Structures are given as C-alpha cells and as structure tokens.
Amino acid sequence: MKIFLLRHASPDRNHTDIPYDIPPGPPLSSKGKKEAAALAVFLKTQGVVKLYYSPFERTVKTAQIVSASNDIPCVEEIKLAEWRGEHETEIHVKARMKSTFDNAFRECAEIGPIGLVSHGGPIDVLLQELGINKDELAIYKTKFDTTNPLPPAGAWEVERNENNHSWNLNLKFIPPTT
C-alpha cells in the first residue's frame, strides 16, 4: 500500500498581481506543465490509480495533466490546501493533512496507490508527523529552495513498515530540469 505525496509543478511567478497563498493562486508556467507531464509518466510506472488535489490553480492543473495522461480520476480535497500563514497554525495544518492522509491510506488498501497533490509547507508538516525529523528534512530543503522538502512536481513515496507501526518515507521522483 503506497501513498505518494506530490508537490504541484512550477507556477508562473510572473503573475505578481495574483496572491500565492490565496486561491486560486498563480497558474502553472510552461516549465511547470512539462514537469507535470514528467510526473505523470513516473506515477504511471508506480500504478497510481487516483489523485486528490488542493483547490489552488497550480495543484488543480498538475492533477489534471497527470489524470488526463494516465486516465485516472482526480478529486478536489480542501484539506490539501496551501498553508494560510498567520491565519493557520502548524497544529491545524498537521491535523488536516494527517486526516486526509489517513483516509487515503485506508482507501489505497482497497484500490491501489493514491497520489495527494499539495504544497511544500503542508507536505513538510506531514512528513514530520509520519516520522522524518527536522534535521533530515533540512538536508532536502537545501537541495531545493530552502523551504520545501521536495522540488516542484516532486514525489515522496510513503509505505507502511512490516511492523505496521512506522512508515518508510522516500523521495522517489525529482523531475528532470529543463
């Protein structure tokens, strides 16, 4: 049973008039569309059968590109939304992300691997909740953009250990640079 924690592909940062952390947020850049297409190829090799995505434009489009390429359903899930900064505590982000993860994990036992398309901050909080310590995450953050534990259109694979009490967490996909 696998869950993939997926960060949206690269947004178009030229839209400075569009707030980044308030829906809809900026659309994908042309680079982001290519990253999402590469993510689709990877997820097909992993047998992902369903996606849930945040309601932000960049996550919606990432999910739509993957869904169309792989002919799998995708469903909006508000709990995967971007961290709302000062309006939302880390405890709240952790609770909503863990709730969504737990529901998806139960579902993947019945249907197969599922992808959750979200944002770097919420994925960071969830990875810590699942057992990665902050020092290890800091190493990943230095590889990307100092605040995110995975690149745009990157994927963490989450599997239950044999003892059923902990998780195997692996950064499985980094899109090729273009």
Where are these regions (language model features)?
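Short hydrophobic/aromatic-enriched beta-strand-loop microsegments
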Residues: 70-78, 135-142
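Beta-strand elements within well-structured catalytic alpha/beta cores of enzymes
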Residues: 2-6, 52, 112-122
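Active-site-proximal alpha-helix that buttresses catalytic centers in soluble enzyme cores
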Residues: 2-76, 83-88, 92-94, 152-153
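Active-site signature of alpha/beta-hydrolase-fold catalytic machinery across serine-
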Residues: 65, 125-129
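Acidic, low-complexity terminal tails and accessory targeting/binding regions
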Residues: 42, 86-91, 110, 128-178
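Internal catalytic-core helix/loop-beta-alpha segment
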Residues: 87-111
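Short active-site segment of divalent metal-dependent hydrolases/proteases
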Residues: 11, 122-123
